[in-house]
């Protein structure tokens, strides 16, 4: 906050987080690094300098692989994005513009200093991204990492994860990059993609019309779906970096590095690979399951309890996911334990209940918990799989509906659905669907 006499102290937790994230992005961890003062005058920085790292960051030369799914074919392509550095610094304040929902129309600005001085990690990426889609996926993969590592919840809407982008264009065949423009104020992954795509088109159009691109900082306006000029962009020399005199250099010993390495869990990319190779899941399903660490752990617990991985995947990514979305819950907040989901899936596989009955029980199990088997027995929902019992019901229906039988035998095979529906109605949905269809086919064709 810039109070006279206040001295900075390094938060040990941020150093551990920086090193763990550095390992996760395959970076080189510096055995020695230091802090520097970054000088600039702006309302969100009360002491007019920011404690950051300049020439000796904690992590350098990393890389992160992203997966790009083709929306039409579903095919997944992988691309490696280089990471220049990861460094520690303190956060600045937040400007709040009043009088309009846009900066360009606001009457005045307020400064929220609540996050000032809070430690953060900043990642600088190599110019390997070529589209808004790639950048958005890259940001999402970084969010997965910080969530798995327990560094942050990664919520962009709350500012836990923030992203600035630099965009430049160049003619096909030209090696030198064009003038870069920085874009700020993107609080969602879709905003990142849209802002980049808009800025690419803006710069191309400007160059084709003979205009020049100036180095500046622009703001993404969500309502206007456009970028607007904010201020000219400073160069590194404008910040007048010099070593932070109030913080000593940082040393990371080999022993400490090994300890932090041992604390790193299985990361999203490793989980995805294991799910595909060992559990036989598709790349898409593996990706959906590993997007949230809690969901992945829930899935693995259900599989460990003896359930078929592919069947559990369907329930977790479809029915349970829909319930969570509709009720704005996380998977840790539901009463349905993974072992009970495994029990429910196994009841379907054994033919004890139908998938339809299982879906009807799901909401109650999610809300109240309990045993799936006991609930089935209590409600009398055990599937009827006795051919003799089903044949008796089907014979009665055929005898009572001769006109429908005649329609079927004259070629109107869709009439079969009528008989299936009647069997389900008489058995309160407990008839084995597969066996019911087989027996009806046999009776009607006979």
Predicted features along the sequence, with ranges:
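Basic, nucleic-acid-interacting segments
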Residues: 1-266, 283, 304-308
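Amphipathic alpha-helical segments in well-ordered regions
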Residues: 17, 21, 199, 302, ...
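Structural motif
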Residues: 280, 303-312, 352-353, 410-414
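Core structural elements
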Residues: 159-171, 276-298, 309-327, 339-341, ...
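Short, structured loop/turn "capping" segments at alpha-beta junctions
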Residues: 206, 323-327, 354-356, 372
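Short, amphipathic C-terminal "tail helix"
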Residues: 413-446
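Extended, non-catalytic structural segments that build the interaction scaffolds
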Residues: 256-263, 270, 300-307, 341-353
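Strongly charged, low-complexity linkers/loops
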Residues: 331-342, 346, 355-425
């Amino acid at each position: 906050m810039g109070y006279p006499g206040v001295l900075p102290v390094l938060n040990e937790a941020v150093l551990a987080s920086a090193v763990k994230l550095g390992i996760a992005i395959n970076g080189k961890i510096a055995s020695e690094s230091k802090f520097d003062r970054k000088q600039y005058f702006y309302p969100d920085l009360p002491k007019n300098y920011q404690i950051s790292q300049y020439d000796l960051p904690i992590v350098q030369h990393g890389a992160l692989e992203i997966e790009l799914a083709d929306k039409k074919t579903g095919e997944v392509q992988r691309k490696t994005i280089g990471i220049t550095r990861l460094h520690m610094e303190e956060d600045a304040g937040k400007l709040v513009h009043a009088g309009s929902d846009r900066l360009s129309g606001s009457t005045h600005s307020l400064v929220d200093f609540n996050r000032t001085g809070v430690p953060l990690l900043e990642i600088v990426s190599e110019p390997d991204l070529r589209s808004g889609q790639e950048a958005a996926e890259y940001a999402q993969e970084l969010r997965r990492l910080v969530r798995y590592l327990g560094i942050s919840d990664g919520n962009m809407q709350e500012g836990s994860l923030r992203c600035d982008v630099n965009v430049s264009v160049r003619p096909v065949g030209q090696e030198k990059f064009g003038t870069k423009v920085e874009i700020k104020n993107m609080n969602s992954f879709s905003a990142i993609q849209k802002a980049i795509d808009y800025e690419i088109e803006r710069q191309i159009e400007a160059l084709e019309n003979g205009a020049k691109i100036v180095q500046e900082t622009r703001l993404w306006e969500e309502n206007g779906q456009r970028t607007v000029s904010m201020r000219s962009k400073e160069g590194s020399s404008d910040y007048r970096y010099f070593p932070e005199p109030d913080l000593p250099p940082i040393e990371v010993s080999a022993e400490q590095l090994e300890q932090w390495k041992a604390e790193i869990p299985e990361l999203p990319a490793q989980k995805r690979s294991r799910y595909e190779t060992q559990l036989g899941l598709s790349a898409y399903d593996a990706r959906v399951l590993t997007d949230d660490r809690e969901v992945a752990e829930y899935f693995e617990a259900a599989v460990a309890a003896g359930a078929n991985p592919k069947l559990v995947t369907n329930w977790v990514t479809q029915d349970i996911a829909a319930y969570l979305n509709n009720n704005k819950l996380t998977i840790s907040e539901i009463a349905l334990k993974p072992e009970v989901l495994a029990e429910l899936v196994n009841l379907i596989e054994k033919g004890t209940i139908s998938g339809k009955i299982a879906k009807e029980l799901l909401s109650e199990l999610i809300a109240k918990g309990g045993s799936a088997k006991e609930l089935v027995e209590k409600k009398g929902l055990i599937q009827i799989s006795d051919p003799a019992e089903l044949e008796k019901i089907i014979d009665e229906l055929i005898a009572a509906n001769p006109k429908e039988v005649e329609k079927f035998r004259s070629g109107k095979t869709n009439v079969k659905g009528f008989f299936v529906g009647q069997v389900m109605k008489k058995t309160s949905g407990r008839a084995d669907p597969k066996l019911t269809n087989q027996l009806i086919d046999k009776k009607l064709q006979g």
